[in-house]
Every structure is written in C-alpha cells, then in structure tokens.
A protein has these predicted regions:
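Short acidic, glycine-rich loop/turn motifs
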Residues: 44-53, 83-85, 219-225, 318-320
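Switch/communication elements of ASCE P-loop NTPase nucleotide-binding domains
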Residues: 1-9, 216-357
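Extended helical coiled-coil dimerization/tether regions that scaffold
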Residues: 162-235, 355-362, 366, 371-378
Length: 378
C-alpha cells in the first residue's frame, strides 16, 4: 500500500527501491492458489497533526483488481477508493465518484473548489483513470494539494516499513564529505556500545570511488595512539551490524511519532536488546510523540504479559490447502472458558500446547529415515 500511494497508480514500477519485490511487481500480490481473479483490499487508519489546531484521524481504503498470481498482462483497475477524515467521508470512488463532506478539511481546500463546487465535481469525475489513485491525482490537483501532501508526507516519512530486516543495510550520505574521514554519530555509537561492539567505536567512512558512506569499526592503536578503521562486516558480529542499521530508524520513529513496521525484527539480535527497544515504545515519558512498533517474529519469547497486552499480540494461521492467512488477536479468546486467556498467564506454554493455534507439528524424522534407507540399499 505504501508503494502504491507514493507512486499514485497500480502499474508496476521500474524502480526496485524496496527489497520487497511485490511493491514494484503487483502481480506477486494475489494468492497463488486462486484460479480466478479476486479483489485485493488495502486499508489503513492513522493519526496526523498539522499544528495544534489541525489534528486528524485519517482512514484510507483501496480495493483493486490485479488479476491472478503472476498475471502480468491483466487489465488492472481500481474497484473502490475511500477517504475519511475524523469519521467523516470526504470521497468515495467506485464506478462513479461521490464527493461528500469537504468541510472537515475546509482549511486545506483550494480556492477554485470553494467557488465552483458543482463544476469542479464534474471535472473530477471525468478525470478518473482506472489505474490511477484519485487521492494523489484528481483530488490532489482539483480539491486539496495541501491535504494530499499531508497524507503523502506521512506515508513517506512516518510510515517506515522494513522488509527483510535480516538483510537491511543503512545507506548514509553526508553533505560535502571528506574522503577517508571517519564520521562517528554520537547517539548510534553510544547505543552500539551498550549493545556490545567489539571495537572502540563505529563510524562511517566515505571512500574515493563510492559516494555512499559505509559502516566501519574504529580502533585506537595502543602503541602509537593512531586511529584505524576496519570495515564493520569484517570485524563486528552480524547481529551488531543489524542493530546499528536499525537503530536510527527507531530514533526517527520516536522523534516523529511514526510507525515502524519490521519484518524479522528479532533475527540475530539479542532478545534483551529487543525488549529494551519495546519498553522504550511503551514508556510514555520517552515516547512523547506516540510512535508505534509493529513486528513479526517466530520467537515465542515475546508471548509475555509483562511486555504486551492481549490485544497487542496477534497470530497468523495459514491454511495448508488454501494458502489463506487468518489474523486474530490473543484477546479474541476472551477471559472465560477452557480457552480463555487471563492476565499474567504463561502465554508461551499455552501456545506450545496449541491452545491459541498458529502452530503446527513439524517432524523431519521420516526424511532422514528415507535417506538412511536409500544409503543402505545403495
């Protein structure tokens, strides 16, 4: 959804800026087990403010026809698009277009909209393109470039999605950098030292042949007191490098009140470091801008009532035959009955006896027995 909103259409993108290939090649999104095309639905609700007098709860829905899995030649089209602000519907786009309550964003409307409401609505209907979002095209151009910018800026700067965090690399650029100089960022370096780096410090070095700064481990030679830098991926652990790459995004989320969505959050990073980050998000004295952290994990250690409320813990159960995934919360089980979930229970032990679902028995023994049998027969 983020990639679609930022480019303003449901066509494929030539720019592979995300490690998630489905963000650029939308034919990868539909369920690969479906024989016929089914609508793909996206929905998001978030809060944004523009000064003390303009605070908004923004709800956006998008329903699209992308064809079947890997169907590149399918004629794609937008089936529905809805924008609501503070509970009021601003527009609804289906086969037709309804412009509804614009008063909720009256301070953001263009002058031409207020003066020529009827004619502007007709122009907007005629501007619809089945592959282009009305939000970032007709609505932006005709009704409110300022409010559209508010939404797009939120998607750009405050909705941070890290796909495949295990392979993430942070690219640093500096204005007018000096070649071979070492740039040490104090906050990141202090966090890295708490995490447990093997060197004296970590910093970024710009080489002669590459514009992007690379992460280096910094040492002081105890004999001659000179500073030496070695590429961090040679000296530091995989988990340390992952932590250093991710930590600036945690800082950005806290500073902006953004949403940080992380795939494979716990890969190669010590659970105590991750729990400290989680506790920072829960700390109202530190998280004054109400930033959010959303992550997936295979590690049941996070099934902990001291870390998360029951409604904050979600499970995903995938059907082996249909490949459909069902998302549900721990709080959906209620607090009574055989499967009721009470505060301060041992969620992890209950999960391992399949009380909450989203777990399957895996036994590789038959595979190895077959290998041994083949070796004996050979």
């Amino acid at each position: 959804l983020r990639a679609i909103v930022l480019r303003g259409n449901i066509r494929n993108s030539e720019e592979k800026s995300s490690p998630n290939p489905a963000a650029a090649a939308l034919e990868l999104i539909p369920n690969n087990n479906e024989m016929e095309s089914k609508p793909v639905c996206f929905e998001i609700e978030f809060y944004e403010e523009d000064g003390e007098d303009h605070k908004f709860k923004i709800h956006y829905e998008l329903e699209v026809d992308l064809g079947t899995f890997l169907e590149e030649e399918h004629q794609r089209k937008i089936l529905a698009e809805v924008l609501e602000v503070n509970g009021e519907r601003v527009f609804e786009r289906t086969q037709d277009l309804k412009i509804e309550n614009l008063k909720v964003i009256k301070d953001y409307l263009s002058d031409i909209t207020e003066q020529n409401a009827d004619s502007v609505n007709e122009i907007a209907k005629n501007s619809l393109n089945q592959e282009e979002l009305f939000l970032t095209n007709g609505f932006k151009l005709i009704f409110s470039p300022k409010f559209t910018k508010l939404i797009v800026d939120w998607f750009t700067n405050k909705f941070m999605v890290i796909y495949r965090a295990d392979s993430m690399q942070l690219i640093k650029r500096f204005a007018d950098p000096k070649k071979k100089a070492i740039y040490v960022e104090k906050t990141t370096d202090e966090a890295a030292k708490l995490f447990g780096i093997n060197s004296n410090a970590v910093g970024y070095v710009v080489s002669d042949d590459e514009p992007d700064a690379k992460l280096y481990s910094v040492f002081k030679n105890m004999k001659n007191k000179k500073t030496t830098a070695v590429a961090a991926d040679i000296f530091e652990s995989y988990g340390t490098i992952r932590f250093i790459n991710m930590f600036p995004l945690v800082i950005k989320a806290m500073q902006t009140g953004g949403i940080l969505v992380v795939d494979e959050f716990d890969a190669s990073i010590h659970p105590m470091a991750l729990m400290s980050i989680i506790n920072v998000f829960h700390n109202d004295d530190v998280n004054i801008h109400h930033a959010q952290l959303i992550f997936n994990t295979h590690n049941p250690i996070f099934l902990n009532s001291n870390l998360f409320r029951r409604d904050e813990i979600k499970f995903v159960e995938r059907g082996d035959d249909t490949h459909d995934s069902v998302l549900y919360a721990l709080s959906d089980f209620g607090t009574t009955g055989d499967k009721g979930v009470r505060k301060h229970e041992d969620y992890m032990s209950k999960y391992f006896i399949s009380q909450y679902g989203a777990i399957k028995d895996i036994d590789f023994t038959p595979i190895f027995e077959e290998i041994l049998c083949d070796e004996k027969e050979g």
